[in-house]
Amino acid sequence: MNNLIEKIIWILTINFMLNACSSVAKDPPKPKNSRINKLDSLLTISEPEAKAIGKRIWINECGGTIEGLTSWNKGEYFASLGIGHFIWYHRIKRGPYEESFPSLVRYLVSKGVNVPEFIFNKHCPWETREDFVKAKNSPQMIELRNLLFSTIPLQTEFILLRLENALPKMVSAISIKNRSKVQSNFYKLTRTAKGKYAL
């Protein structure tokens, strides 16, 4: 089983590295406070890297559209937001997945981003998918999309931080003899933009 997990990780990594995305989608704007960023980790990502990687993720995950940054899939009971499909639950119905949107909001605030007041609410303001769809063109939804579009590079940083924070758990699922090698290879991949994108 451990070998299977290791093989899957390597296949996915190689696949992502080999499949470069090409698109003519408009570049997301860089945040006002952009600069070369040292993440709160062992990872470093430059502003151009964060922007380019974020654009690729945005195209792959959201179709390169601003509307694609806010979604709520049929059969689910949570909003899926941003390039990382960050989950945001309503207070009434929680789920088995880790809620990641509030953590993203805290990260954005720590980077000096002004976020709309309603986002500071601990829970998603839309109770159901139907409520969410009805609010498609509401001022709140437009404000949310604008925030998500303007922070694509910061979302990229946040995705990498979450991945690095999950590394110990991922490594614990493989054989002890391969753990240091996999961890070393993880950080080798983070030294290049293509490696960061693959991760």
Which residues does each PLM region occupy?
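Bacterial N-terminal signal peptides that target proteins for export
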Residues: 1-9
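Intrinsically disordered, low-complexity segments enriched in glycine/proline and serine/threonine
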Residues: 9-10, 64
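Bacterial N-terminal signal peptides
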Residues: 10-19
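Cell-wall polysaccharide-cleaving catalytic domain and substrate-binding groove, primarily
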Residues: 22-199
